[in-house]
Amino acid sequence: MSGLLRRRRVFAAKVEATVGTAESLTAAEAAFNAEEFTIQPNVAITRRQGQGGFNYLPGIPEGMQGTCTVRFGMSYNGTTLPSWASVLLPACGWVATGLVLSPVTQGPGGAAGVKTLTIGEYKDGKLSILSGAMGTWKIIAETGKQAMIEFTFTGKYSTNETDIAILTPTYPTVLPIRVANGALTFNSVALCTASVEIDSGNTVTMRECVNASDRSGYVSAIVTDRAPVITANPESALVATQDRDALWLTSSAQAFSMQIGATGNSITIAAPKAQLENKQQGDRNGIMADDLTWLCTAGSSADTELTITFD
């Protein structure tokens, strides 16, 4: 028997029609340019002590869940939402209205459009699946490099691995957007950064239920809280240009906006009320920098603290 190759893998994901009920996956659901993805089961075994000596009886599996980590270059063709956004972000609580994705405070399956996913990892003749999955995301934008988004999903590990032929999808051909020729501002002042990270800050929990329709012990995952955070390392500025100590130490929330790419083929992440939570001195190859952390606080209404707009 030849060895199975780790690089020979395909990622697939599909929105579930019924929360927590696994969907069948086909090549159409694998039309992603996914990188560094894997599904890891997380199933504890309860040990059972035997009698008469130092021995144990066969253990009992507890709740059956797992995680999937996956990352994508942030591609966009300038017209329609890419699959990494239209399929995966609603399972993180960010729902699209046209080309704008906004956070929603609601469990999956409701009218607001929050979803759960069935996720498959096809790996050189085998398949692992999570169902009822929801997750959290983080955007990594390093200047001059492709913009990346990383997802971590949690879901039910309700079926064992199976042997199955690997899918052969038609992959997207649109290139990821480079972090260049864009715009980055805080309180209307341009920031010159080497790196920006934007973390959705979701708290994902499994919904235990004795009435669950499979062996897992869970209905699905659910997002129960979020605290979006932005970190960046802009060059330091004179106080006359931007008084960052004052912005930090007076609880002053101001607008943050980052446009990745040129207008007409760009992705903009906006936080209308970003509050500086920390400011430390940094060093970028001898250039004075400020290591900044913002919390995306409430905007003018609920669920407006952090939006993603495709232009």
Feature locations, PLM:
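Signature of extracytoplasmic/envelope-associated structural regions
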Residues: 1-311
